[in-house]
């Protein structure tokens, strides 16, 4: 029988090797699932299928896992390396019978009694043939395990490129044997748990059935909230209810997605081609966090940072290839143009107007539509920044969508809602040239198909893309911990806890995104070159600085979630030089090579530096304090950092608490000492003159931020009772003057929003009295610190400008 079975497998292997693509999930199961290949592995398949077994074997061999068709030799016994959990239609009866599976697992368990060093890993693994969830009108979904061989051949031809092999977290049979014993009841219990696991896994990969769009519209238009909004619309505009209802339908049609599975498959092909054309690869980290939430039945809300229009496509593509359901995406109405709007809508996009304040009908319909998506179990994605960042930094969160998400949790507390912040990064952003023009005052060009094609056509070799899933926030857990009264309150936004809770969650999302920063070659090279006032360094200096950055990130990482490049400094520099449109010029003289940024490229490179500015801002602050003092007690460094930190924390969404700050400052000092950038004699910190150039370049990351703080603090010291609007305007005006006189290229340096945020931070940290007048005694503490770490030249420019402002006011 075994020879016939082997012949059958060999026969199947030939067409399957051509028809079915290797798509293991995760892509590196040994590393991502922490599998120990020095210990035996047994693969658990959900049902009897020689076709699935052959595909699993093909994927196992491609990722370095043991061959499932070979046996495990243990304690003088030869046991199969795979078992089938359940029956399925097949030509040959084999070890797939359920009773045989239980016996095999029981034998593995018994071996752990006689072999104390044995730890067999039971790895559940299944094949996903296509990912269509079906539609609501369908009576039942096709069960692929019930397909006969001819049907599966047809499925392989149609879905072969969309077949995924899903490896799950291993179960340690050593643990099971030690904790629960080795009899048949334990094997049966494992089988029952595995059945539930495979069912959940299938649901997490396909999601709930796709809605009948018209039926959903009819249901929503009959909801009490929308009926009331229609009645109010008819009354306020003096129109008939029927006309108001038609307007409501029109709004709903404008908003709602129209997901089409075949459309997703076509989009997957196109996006695969697009990434290969534009980027050298997509680095995905921590997807297992999301897979775990999906298996546990969480409603998932993805909240990525917003760098580019391509973010919409990238995250859906990544999720699809990680075995997860592409989400419904809240997209700006500006993207609803032909033919992109139709394609996005079929891929899961639902469209939102930029503003709908005062439009009760629209806001009610949108809120009810979002709640319906949550109720039906669809994952959702929205960009909390509200728009793409033109500067490379995170923008202040817009809380409207988060408010609706928290309201949806209140209305339906059956399934937990988890927010998954996502860091999206690129070594080259498609629209970065456009951003630079807009920051110089050019009008924003309206999105259209021609613009998209022009951008894509002229770009290629843009380096790497990065998607890093940050630490999730389960809303009910967060609210229970920080706002326990949320469960007892009414369903209304005006509850005392509601707005503070929404703001706190939104802020935590931004913090978690920054904790998951993906640091790349462009970020590091741009940071180093922009730290030089001439935007130029010798090759030796640049490589030395890159090496310093890398060592710091290894020994004093900003967080456990950040992605750090493992290439050598030489490889990093070579990679950047090989990218297109970088604007990095290599010049040679008698002393060697110089690397210089073109002036026009400096603003563009600032974008990439700003992506990771939060990672280096604290070491930059510590370097500045030590450098400008020459020698200073460690405690004074910590005190100064504590005073400045609250403002940096709010501006750059830093994650350290006040207690954690002291510990991290100590780590920074230890690392600077290890690199011999500073000297430490007992508690006295001083400059190491032999390495002073590297320390000077470290300082630059915080220089412009501190200069902005100094501008606002100086104005407040001069005029404590100045109006907020005037303070913002004067701060911006002086910053513009400073940028011209001192050659500051950072586009956010004189951004009014940044000054507004700093003033708000001063207020929240107690630097204004109850009448809105600045408390000069407290401001003097900040000013004293800034006086010592800002160059005299810059101070004089600022003080002179503040003095002229005062003269104008008096005049």
UniProtKB/Swiss-Prot annotation:
A motif (HXXXXD motif) lies at residues 305-310. It is an enzyme of class 2 (transferase). Its EC number is 2.3.1.15. GO terms for molecular function: glycerol-3-phosphate O-acyltransferase activity. It holds the Pfam family Acyltransferase. It catalyses: sn-glycerol 3-phosphate + an acyl-CoA = a 1-acyl-sn-glycero-3-phosphate + CoA. The keyword ATP-binding does not apply. Its main location: membrane. SUPFAM superfamilies: Glycerol-3-phosphate (1)-acyltransferase. Keywords: Acyltransferase, Cell inner membrane, Cell membrane, Lipid biosynthesis, Lipid metabolism, Membrane, Phospholipid biosynthesis, Phospholipid metabolism, Transferase. The keyword Lipid biosynthesis applies. The HXXXXD motif is essential for acyltransferase activity and may constitute the binding site for the phosphate moiety of the glycerol-3-phosphate. Belongs to the GPAT/DAPAT family. This is Glycerol-3-phosphate acyltransferase. It comes from Histophilus somni (strain 129Pt). The gene is plsB.
